[in-house]
From Swiss-Prot:
Catalyzes two activities which are involved in the cyclic version of arginine biosynthesis: the synthesis of N-acetylglutamate from glutamate and acetyl-CoA as the acetyl donor, and of ornithine by transacetylation between N(2)-acetylornithine and glutamate. The keyword Transcription regulation does not apply. Substrate binds at residues 172, 198, 209, 296, 419, 424. InterPro entries: Arg_biosynth_ArgJ, ArgJ-like_dom_sf, ArgJ_beta_C. Keywords: Acyltransferase, Amino-acid biosynthesis, Arginine biosynthesis, Autocatalytic cleavage, Cytoplasm, Multifunctional enzyme, Transferase. PANTHER family: ARGININE BIOSYNTHESIS BIFUNCTIONAL PROTEIN ARGJ, ARGININE BIOSYNTHESIS BIFUNCTIONAL PROTEIN ARGJ, MITOCHONDRIAL. GO terms for cellular component: cytoplasm. The gene is argJ. It is found in: Cytoplasm. The record marks 208-209 as: Cleavage. This is Arginine biosynthesis bifunctional protein ArgJ.
Amino acid sequence: MQLRLPHLQRSKSMAKPLPVSPLARPLPDLATIAGVRLSAVAAGIRYQGRTDLMLAEFVPGTVAAGVYTKNACPGAPVLWCREALTTPYARALLVNAGNANVFTGRAGIQACEDCADATAQLLDCPPQDVFLASTGVIGEKLPQDRIIAALPAARAGLEENGWADAARAIMTTDTFPKAARRDVKINGTPVRIQGIAKGSGMVAPDMATMLAYVATDAKLPQNVLQSLLASGCAQSFNSITVDSDTSTSDMLMIFATGLADNPEVDDVNDPALAEFTLALNDLLLELALMVVRDGEGATKLVRIAVTGADSNLSAHRIALCIANSPLVKTAIAGEDANWGRVVMAVGKSGEPADRDRLSVAIGGTWIAKDGGVVENYDEAPVVAHMKGQEIEIAVDLDLGDGQARVWTCDLTHGYIDINGSYRS
């Protein structure tokens, strides 16, 4: 296809190993998805002593859908995938860690073409049925020869139970692998949804340095898959932020093998899809929250709920403004219940707000109501809440029915330590 324009991790690019996040979650009991095989190998792209290349093979007839970064400087693999998605089918997914293949000009495009051609030859499929992703350092040419040389081993290692190894292979500054699973029914037919993700820094809507891949054995057409994924992404990966930086490489994809052979569903609003839709949304949110839990240097997960806004969009923007405020994030890191910084963030958002109708709560305790401090406010429960690992901030604007939820993490010196030495 011609392209139109939990462990300690050590790498060449980081002098010290990264400790596992205190907010880490263990891998769940992963199962298999009929029609999907995965493998992970060491291609030596950037890291030493670990796998850095994952390959997934899908049964013929697998349907794909995806959403990609809105960054104006996308990587070559993002452009490749957008083009590949103009046809509904997928036979392979190839993901490397350590090099983003971004801002590499014609060489980056050629690397995609070479990797897709080599994968297609091994799996006997058209190159346009091969989806590609790269994550890592920007501006360095992708050593595709190393990837291509590792492909035979990747093909030989393909297995149905390769999910956990695949999750580890795509990590960069991640400190733990991320995966989730759901078992549901469509019209009485059992179907399974399972996914993996990576992400730790450069995380902010629209999506981030975030890769997430979900597979299901459900039989669904591409238009339905695309609608489900876009809707689920809005409530999950587009509602998280670590550092407000939107990556050049992020993508979220779903692959449906159809082997569950459920009754055909060709309308996203069909009641038969209700259980599947809820499960997919829940799985996507679980994966997204794992990314926030693994935010670079993070020690606290923060949930920000905004209600009473002029519209849902306005509520979302206000929540993100709070979540991205360095003053709010550092106060949380210092366990300081400095609610005035929340008020500041609301006011600077550019969205409709009335100081005299604004209310703020932390940990379920209302601190300010209707533009003033609550009478006889007792800070003790708020101080106790700030010492926990999961912080809740609520804001009510009392202007309308708009509401939104956004998740972020605190901002510690660990973020500087990791990013100050990322390439050294």
